[in-house]
Amino acid sequence: MKLSPKAAIEVCNEAAKKGLWILGIDGGHWLNPGFRIDSSASWTYDMPEEYKSKTPENNRLAIENIKDDIENGYTAFIITLKM
């Protein structure tokens, strides 16, 4: 599912509340219709073995990444979560 910047940040906030790890974010441009991914706007954060204590930091970094991408003109995102 492609998400607007606001929705992508909301997903990260909800993931943090539920203790879910954000594995990656891919930024791109919504073209109406369609989505063009930009490989230079791909963010991943390796999941350590003892990840639960680091989940809040991971999700904070994910939100910071989205905000940086918004400033760089990206308009749509795909988020990958670890359930």
Swiss-Prot record:
GO BP terms: bacteriocin immunity
Alphabetized, the UniProt keywords read: Bacteriocin immunity, Plasmid
What the entry lists under Gene3D superfamilies is as follows:
3.30.190.30
Q: Where are the transmembrane segments?
A: none
Q: Which Pfam families match?
A: ImmE5
| Matching InterPro entries | Colicin-E5_imm, ImmE5_sf
Q: Which SUPFAM superfamilies match?
A: ImmE5-like (SSF143469)
Q: What is this protein's record name?
A: Colicin-E5 immunity protein in ColE9
